[in-house]
Amino acid sequence: MASNTPRPTKAERRAAARAKAKALREEQERRERRAKITRRSLLGAATVVVVGAGAGLVVYSRKNTVVGNSFPGVAEADGSVTFGAPLTPGTSNDGAPVLDVFFDYSCHFCAAFDTLHTEEITTLLRDGRITLALRPCKILGQNWTDIVMNGMGLVLDQQPDTALDFHNAAFSLFSEIYNSQDGNRLTVDELASTAKSTGVSGSIVDAFNKTVKDNSYGTWTETGTGTFKDKGLQSTPTVLLDGTQLDLQTLSTETALTEAVDGLAGGASGTPAPGDDG
């Protein structure tokens, strides 16, 4: 007999995301102690390397060294892209604190963070309470990061009004693939299908393959990665509010960022970001 079990509601999915985020934080504490050593090992490893919590999920080749010169017109010189109340790139909310999110599109912790806080961040933006600065980088060495960065670069340049939705959908897709451990789905076609679902036009989606093949936005990726390293950061996601690094353990609920913003006026505690003056 066919199952009539309904699909999980949005509330149920977000509750599951909260539970997963808690588990991931505990795992992250263990993994971050090994992170520096692991990344150094990858740099000196064989031409084809397997990394990730689920061995075999992602395979990348170090010989893919093509770097294109395209740079999104709305991106800042450091590679970041800001969003204000209109939810379009290159905008900001005057006088509002900046929420900086450093991430790698191949980071499942980043995907869990994004899934949990998507609606909250959208509300804070629309209410003019923050300016969001997305700060993509490539620290895990994965081809998937290049695929999404090139797709995102194209969307930012050609259909920017869909960029934030595309960003969130790309993370949602990665979470789904990561949880299924089906690395065969980490393809341009999967990303293209996701892009269409967020309203990206067919003509732009059709250009994904060539853009990825040419690594057209490779310079943008390298710039964001350089910014991450120059600031002395160690892992993703790294989240700053008004220049102060937030403890990920305090961000496990879907209202945690709002509470942090509320606390700014009262002198909320935090850690000054590495590389900043204070």
Residue ranges, per PLM feature:
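Processing junctions and N-termini across compartments
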Residues: 101-104, 233
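A short beta-strand-turn-helix
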Residues: 78-97
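C-terminal region of N-terminal signal peptides and the immediate post-cleavage residues
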Residues: 54-75
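Short strand->helix junction
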Residues: 106-108, 246-247
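N-terminal export signals
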Residues: 40-59
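C-terminal cap of thioredoxin/glutaredoxin-like
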Residues: 2-34, 38-40, 60, 64, ...
